[in-house]
Swiss-Prot record:
One of its GO terms (cellular component) is mitochondrial small ribosomal subunit. This is Small ribosomal subunit protein bS1m. It comes from the Eukaryota. Component of the mitochondrial ribosome (mitoribosome), a dedicated translation machinery responsible for the synthesis of mitochondrial genome-encoded proteins, including at least some of the essential transmembrane subunits of the mitochondrial respiratory chain. The mitoribosomes are attached to the mitochondrial inner membrane and translation products are cotranslationally integrated into the membrane. Residues 436-470 are annotated as: Disordered. It is found in: Mitochondrion. It comes from Neurospora crassa (strain ATCC 24698 / 74-OR23-1A / CBS 708.71 / DSM 1257 / FGSC 987). Belongs to the bacterial ribosomal protein bS1 family. Residues 453-464 have a biased composition (Low complexity). GO terms for molecular function: structural constituent of ribosome. Component of the mitochondrial small ribosomal subunit (mt-SSU). Mature N.crassa 74S mitochondrial ribosomes consist of a small (37S) and a large (54S) subunit. The 37S small subunit contains a 16S ribosomal RNA (16S mt-rRNA) and 32 different proteins. The 54S large subunit contains a 23S rRNA (23S mt-rRNA) and 42 different proteins. The gene is mrp51. Keywords: Mitochondrion.
Length: 470
């Protein structure tokens, strides 16, 4: 006979408390069929899906990780960094299913060592341009807000990052048809009521504008105000006629549908793409940073950094304040090849980034570090770079923008880690002693030096001719 064991009130409280429970698992990133590496089981995921746990060294030696049961020492004490991810607290075998969490745990530590903030993405893809947009933090007070009133939700659409509706440009044809059938079509009646409110507001605004113009012609100081029209006063024929007029105004129609369904901003297509999408030709450009790639699936910072700015100075103990931040070493993962789309790929703090662009040192012709792969280099080829910007794209992946580091900054960084082979400003010049050439003393010179002063070879006193008297 099966029976259920009773749980104490304290145990039930701990089980239901969010403070003493692991957060739910985040869905994994969608796989791309064109990139088979994302389908491999050994590949590192784009972002962590499980909570990473750590413990003290004294507790790890006992297998105590703060869980329901201790973890085996053989698989947890052999690693340098104590980090695990719990997949399942109680499996079918009544054990705790866990795996190593150093993949994302060390990546987080490496990224936080860079001390750079997360910025909103920009549409400028060429960092070598002279004009660079000002980096805007994702934690600004006017953008890092999710609770909006209905009016603010419409006014702040260009600054928001969270929407209840989808991003239409990122949907497949099948997903779009399913969205129309299950979400849009059942809301026809609600949309007509929404249009009634818009018509009532427009009629009220037009009436007030007419009253103000009439008062201005009469010379009245104060104009009368029209009582707001009620949405119930708008007939179905007016709604139908208004919808017919909207068919010829793509921008107004898209704005109203986007406000009603709370759709993410959509960037208009380019001139070449506009021919295939004739309905999107007249759409105006959006100022939203997520119009081109879509809003992020998480918070724009992804929880990887909470810094708001990089406006600080590094103070060197010997050389004083530095103009730029310390550079970091990057590993060349893929050398540069000739042709479009074959740029070099480098690894920075656990992330893959594009190589420095423009006329930089690493792009000079004949630079063997970026041009070819040399397997004889221990640990792989490396170069020093500066991390200029970090963003999180719509799929939750961290994108880094790097540039070549200055030679002086590289020497200072090498000196701090004891790898500088030569002084930064060169060795101090040695003090040059004033030397005199020694001339050998001959017998004649000795006789002339010690010659008797009573019989000089030349007169010791000048005559009157020496003073110009003769």
């Amino acid at each position: 006979m099966a029976f259920s064991r009773g749980v104490s009130p304290g145990g039930a409280l701990l089980r239901t408390s969010r403070m003493f429970s692991l957060p739910p698992v985040i869905p994994p990133p969608p796989g791309n069929k064109l990139q088979m590496i994302s389908e491999r089981a050994s590949a590192t995921e784009a972002y962590p899906t499980h909570q990473v746990l750590t413990t003290f060294e004294s507790s790890r030696s006992r297998g105590d990780w703060g869980l329901k049961r201790p973890l085996p020492l053989k698989s947890t004490t052999g690693t340098t960094y104590p980090m695990v991810k719990v997949k399942e607290m109680d499996s079918l075998e009544q054990i705790t299913d866990f795996t190593s969490g150093t993949q994302h745990g060390l990546t987080l530590k490496k990224f936080q060592a860079l001390n750079i903030p997360i910025s909103t993405p920009s549409e400028i893809s060429d960092p070598s341009r002279l004009f660079r947009p000002v980096q805007r933090s994702v934690f600004e007070a006017d953008t890092d807000v999710t609770a909006f009133s209905p009016d603010e939700q419409i006014q702040e659409a260009e600054k928001r990052w969270k929407f209840s509706g989808p991003w239409l440009a990122g949907m497949t044809p099948g997903e779009f048809k399913e969205y129309l059938a299950k979400t849009v079509r059942p809301k026809r009646a609600e949309f007509r009521k929404f249009i009634q409110k818009k018509i009532a507001a427009q009629k009220t605004e037009a009436a007030n504008r007419e009253l103000q113009e009439t008062a201005a012609l009469r010379g009245d100081a104060v104009a009368e105000t029209q009582e707001p029209f009620k949405p119930e006063s708008i007939t179905d024929d007016e709604v139908t006629e208004y919808l017919r007029r909207l068919r010829n105004d793509n921008q107004v129609l898209y704005d109203l549908v986007g406000q009603f369904l709370d759709l993410a901003p959509l960037k208009p297509p380019q001139a070449a793409e506009a021919r295939q999408h004739s309905l999107l030709v007249n759409l105006r450009a959006t100022d939203s940073p997520y119009g081109g790639r879509g809003p992020p699936i998480t918070h724009p910072s992804a929880g990887i950094s909470y810094l708001r700015t990089a406006a600080y100075l590094n103070n060197h103990p010997i050389y004083g304040p530095q103009k730029s931040h310390p550079p970091v070493q990057a590993r060349v993962l893929k050398p540069r090849r000739g042709g479009l789309g074959n740029d070099a790929k480098i690894g920075v703090a656990g992330f893959v980034a594009d190589g420095p662009l423009g006329t930089s040192h690493s792009n000079l012709r004949g630079n063997s570090v970026m041009d070819k792969f040399d397997p004889s280099i221990e640990g792989g080829a490396k170069l020093w770079v500066n991390v200029d910007k970090a963003t999180v794209d719509s799929t939750g992946r961290v994108q880094l923008t790097v540039s070549d580091a200055k030679a002086t900054d590289v020497l200072i960084a090498k000196e701090l880690i004891g790898d500088a082979r030569e002084p930064i400003f060169g060795s101090a010049p040695k003090r040059q002693e004033k030397t005199f050439k020694k001339i050998p003393m001959t017998a004649a010179r000795l006789r002339g030096r010690y010659e008797n002063s009573d019989s000089p070879s030349s007169p010791t006193m000048s005559g009157s001719s020496g003073y110009g008297l003769r």
